[in-house]
Design a protein with these regions (language model features):
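Glycine/proline-enriched, intrinsically flexible loops and inter-domain linkers
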Residues: 1-178
Length: 178
């Protein structure tokens, strides 16, 4: 049975309420996340929509978060949380969709819906071990002014995809096609 991530959003004068009350209860599988991770995802989604949002804790003060205890988005021990990347993208998606219903001009469509990660490991010529882990992009939803990105980073952070030249300089890898 699918696990529901549902958001009701209320915009007030200078504040908003993000209410996840209709979200599924925590589950036996590893896709649960903590309350703090949920709040961090909300910040990241809002930062993607409102570029001028500063990167400080004060930015969260006008936001009320309603996240039920022991839900998918506020799991308690011993519920597993190791597969959280899929769930955090759902939070970002529902915020994008909710805000696009408030004003279609402020939010783009959802991104590609999962995490594209590459993990490689090996030994250097001198015998030292190396491990490379990097996120790579995918397609993003469109917006009123045009199509979305065809190869953007997952909106799970405000980071960017590392330049391939940096990865090639740091690890014994060579990218021949991108």
């Amino acid at each position: 049975e699918p696990l529901r991530v549902a958001l009701d959003i209320e915009i007030r004068d200078n504040s908003m309420c993000l209410d996840f009350s209709r979200t599924a209860r925590s589950c036996a599988g590893p896709v649960n996340i903590s309350r703090s991770t949920t709040i961090a995802c909300c910040y990241v989604a809002l930062k993607h929509i409102f570029k001028e949002v500063p990167a400080n804790s004060g930015v969260l003060s006008p936001i009320e978060f309603v996240i039920p205890e022991d839900s998918l988005l506020s799991a308690s021990a011993p519920r597993p949380v190791g597969g959280y990347t899929e769930t955090i993208l759902r939070i970002i998606d529902v915020i994008f969709v909710a805000l696009s219903q408030v004003d279609p001009l402020i939010s783009n469509g959802c991104a590609y819906g999962t995490i594209n990660a590459l993990s490689l490991a090996g030994h250097r010529r001198d015998g030292r071990r190396w491990v490379m882990f990097s996120f790579f992009g995918g397609g993003h939803g469109g917006h009123p002014e045009g199509d979305g990105l065809n190869h953007g980073n997952a909106p799970i952070s405000t980071a960017t995809i590392p330049p391939l030249e940096i990865l090639e300089a740091a690890y014994p890898v060579l990218f021949t096609k991108w």
